[in-house]
Amino acid sequence: MAVRAGALILAAALAAASAVAPFSSMAPGAALPEGWRALHIARIAPSEISLAADEGVTVLRVHSHASAGSAAFALDRPVAGTLAWRWKIDRVVAKAELDEKHGDDFAARVYVFFDIPDDAFPWTERLRLKIGRLLYGAELPSAAICYVWDNSHPVGTSAWNPYSRRVRTVVVESGAAQAARWVDEKRDLAADFRAAFGEAFAGRSRITGIAAGNDTDQTGEEATAWFGDLRIETPR
């Protein structure tokens, strides 16, 4: 999903939570769990977002065909803890290119949204954010990390999104070798935040939401992603 303003909007009507509602608590075919909302980008065909059964467990399914979409959940918590999830894809997006606008497509994405002080960004990005919030509302997050399943770049590759230097893309899976298999992930949110936006802002920032989805609107390809429950684990 290319980060064009609408992709980052979290539902203003949703009360921010401290824990993420699980997909596995719902029946296949039911509406998304309370707190989750489907997000689509204006003027781009919407991906199919649904709850489906996989190996006896209800998971999130996102199917895209020259389209884009995700499910988002609003949060309000400090930049700390470990984000854990599992995901599966049917194929990679063959023509994707993570640092080019024409190739900004991924078989699966997981976003973490942040509220970061304005002085973390150059004036050009501050101006874009101000305009975006005037157009789309104050709920537009100021920054995000986007964990992706890429087609070819090595795991660990990190780059600014080609549409915004407020969004850092991090490759956590790459290639088709693990396609059609569930893969477990864990990310240290504080460490990833510091790597993307700097140590100085971690204590003054908040996590404002997460999202899971995929997109093929740039390349015109087709891909399906499945996501198990997403959770933020904190040390006891």
For each predicted feature, which ranges?
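Bacterial N-terminal signal peptides
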Residues: 6-16
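Extracellular carbohydrate-recognition regions
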Residues: 17-41, 123-129
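Extracellular beta-strand elements of beta-rich domains used
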Residues: 23, 210, 229-232
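Short carbohydrate-recognition loop motifs
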Residues: 48-69
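Extracellular/lumenal carbohydrate-interaction signature centered on repeated Trp-anchored short motifs
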Residues: 73-83, 176-179, 203-204
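Solvent-exposed strand-to-loop "edge" motifs in beta-rich extracellular domains
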Residues: 86-92, 115-117, 190
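Extracellular/luminal beta-rich ligand-recognition
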Residues: 105, 109, 115-163
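Extracellular beta-strand ligand-recognition surfaces/modules
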Residues: 108-110, 164-175, 179-220, 224
